[in-house]
Amino acid sequence: TEVAQAQLIAIVKDGALIESAGKGDKVQLIVNQTPFYGESGGQVGDIGNIRFENGEANIVDTKRSVGVFVHFAEINSGILSVNEAVELEVEGLRRSSVRANHSATHLLHEALRNKLGNHVAQRGSLNAADRLRFDFSHSKALTKDELVAVQSSVNFYIRQNTEVSTRVMSPDDARKLGATALFGEKYGEEVRVVSMGYQQKSGKGLDGNGYSLELCGGTHVKRTGDIGAFLILSDGASSSGVRRIEALTGEAALDHLAKQQNYLTEIALELKTSLFDILSKVKSLTAERKSLVNELSQLRKDMALAEVAGESDELKSEDLSGVNFLV
């Protein structure tokens, strides 16, 4: 849900509890129930707004601390008081983008494990509205072919458009289903398992045909097709033995591809060639430039030798006290 009625339990300003806050105040709000997701597990916190009897406030971030959701707010109008009834509303479009990036991260994790090996494990992540970042254990850079294969795999399961399901169970039951746990995470008596994708006879899931199963408390799309598209931007070293992939999904991925297309079209026009002949044209121009540089270098050497030879021809001999000198 993205909208909820609640009661304001506490207001914090500059580290101290206060009874009320007015226009312009930057405060932290705690309510008895909330539709907002608090930053955790690599997923950013929700933003949105909170409305009350005589005013409203923007929620610019949400964090979770010891099970308590803290809403970082800026009061736009009115006076907000403790125990007041409020209505909270999450910014839906932003949450949708975050959900898409989080679900794509799960598909990316599984694609990397399938392509590179089971040594691949998550070492960190960021699931924001505009991009995703995924750190994983691997000792060397991915080749161009590996990156293409991983990206293609993620897009395959996006197009598969399977339902994304969540189930709460014991950690032991989750392990029996083949769910992946995050390195270093501590789990309680119950865990939430998020599954997506169909892979025949994978041995994962209730029917043994699951693709990605992970222990996760974050928000996700309803179907993998809701992700839209997946585009890898870069693969680099995060630290020793850890690689980092940055990627885009949905409209952001399509916009990036459109910009690339426009840029390549401009280059092709400048080079007076087609899009698919740009590389051969650049290689030809590079070879031509190298040849010209070599010719110019040789010409300069020849000119220098000619100058030396010319100076030698102009040398004259003079006799001083019976000794010949070249001048």
Regions found by a protein language model. Give the residues of each.
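A glycine- and charged-residue-rich anion-binding loop/surface
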Residues: 1-327
